From Swiss-Prot:
Keywords: Initiation factor, Protein biosynthesis. One of its GO terms (biological process) is cytosolic ribosome assembly. One of its GO terms (molecular function) is translation initiation factor activity. Binds to the 50S ribosomal subunit and prevents its association with the 30S ribosomal subunit to form the 70S initiation complex. Belongs to the eIF-6 family. The gene is eif6. This is Translation initiation factor 6. It comes from the Archaea. HAMAP family: eIF_6 (MF_00032). It comes from Methanococcus maripaludis (strain C6 / ATCC BAA-1332).
Amino acid sequence: MIMKTYFSGVSTLGVHSLATEDYGFFPLSVDQKTMERMKNVLDIPATQLNISNSSLIGSLCVGNSNGLLVPDITTEKEVELIKMFLKENSLDVNLERLKAKNTAFGNLILTNNKGCIISEELSRFRKTIEDVLDVESGVGNYAELATVGSNGVATDKGCLVHPLTDELELEWIQNILRVDYVERGTANRGVTSVGACILANSKGAVVGGDTSGPEILKIEEALDLID
């Protein structure tokens, strides 16, 4: 199932939210009706919060069913809210505050429950990232971009990446994430940073409201969401 929506008129949903196979985080500005629809499409419990007093949840955080990485600038109150949410939903998730110069973990890491791709900019933290997310990783960039997280969206079934990703990079991504499908595509009528525009897991996807019909078809194919 795929849903189109905006967050307060903004279509870059992946910048402001995080979705995994088992939980989701959304900005405080999202109305309850939209929240419930997204939870239904993705079939996950979710809560609304800030990270580092910011709505840029998807840019700053990265997570899967095993772990969640947040920047060291995340406040104590925000960490406690996350812990409470995880406990209330009986989710056994490793929560790690990582101190790094570049705090945009969501932009620099692409992960599912089988593997993760780490930007060269975070290569020194590879062991910590692997331990928290409990997956093996590959370090590198693709499409000549360091922002491997914001330029891709991955689930346990498939992955959609920047349209300039080459064939060797597609094979590399597929091997690391251990998915059946890796496709190139766009969202929001030509935006190449697909991770900034899409929230997805193996059960559904929520895409920016500007996403076209042909783009939705490609997203469905890449993430194996066609019924």
